[in-house]
Amino acid sequence: MTKVRLVPWSEHDFQLLVRLNAPEMTQHLGGPETPESIQLRHKRYVAAAKSGTFSDDEKGYAAYIFKAILEPDGVAVGGVNFWDRDWNGETVYEMGWGVLPEYQGRGIASAAVGEAVELARATQRRSAIHAFPSLDNGPSNSICRKAGFELRGEVQFEYPKDHWMQCNDWVLRFAS
C-alpha cells in the first residue's frame, strides 16, 4: 500500500511548484502559468500554509495547502490542497491535487487525496468537499470515484481566471 504524508507547504517548495506547472501537468487546466504567476502562487501557498487563510481582493477564506511526501523515501512528489468555495449557494471545500509525472500511476494521488479528505473532515467546518477535474482527465476522475466522491454531473468551471473548461462536479458529503 502506498504511504503518503501531507506536510504544510513551505518557502522551500518553490521548485516543486515549478515542476507541477509543467505543460504535461497542466494540460487539463489550460496550460502552464507564467513564471510571475507561479511566484505569486508560491507566496500565497506559503502564507496560507502558515495562517490557514488565502487573501483575495481583501477577502480572506480558509485554505489548507500541502506537499505530498512519499514514504519511506521522504521525497516530495506532489501537492494536494483544499479551500473554501461558494458553490450553488453553499460554502464547501474545493480540492485539487497533482503528482509529478515520474510518480504517477502508483496510487500516490489516491493516497494523498484520502489523507486530505480526512483532514478536511476533521476541521468540522464544512459539510462537503468538491473536486472539479476536466472531463478528459481520466486519472483524476478515477481518483474521485475511488475516494468515495459522488458524480453530480458536468459543469462549466473557471480555472485559472478567465479560462473556462468543462468539468465533472464530484462531491463527498461528510456525515454530521
Regions found by a protein language model. Give the residues of each.
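Sparse recognition of residues in long alpha-helices and their boundaries
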Residues: E33-T34, F54, E90, P160
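Helix-loop element at the rim of GNAT/NAT acetyltransferase active sites that forms part
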Residues: R19-E36, R44-K50
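Charged, solvent-exposed alpha-helical segments that act as regulatory interaction surfaces
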Residues: G30, S51-S55, D73
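Amphipathic alpha-helical interface surfaces
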Residues: I38-R41, G78
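A short helix-loop-beta-strand connector motif used in the catalytic cores of GNAT acetyltransferases and
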Residues: V46-K67
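Acyl-donor (CoA/ACP) binding surface of acyl/acetyltransferases
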Residues: M1-H28, I65-S176
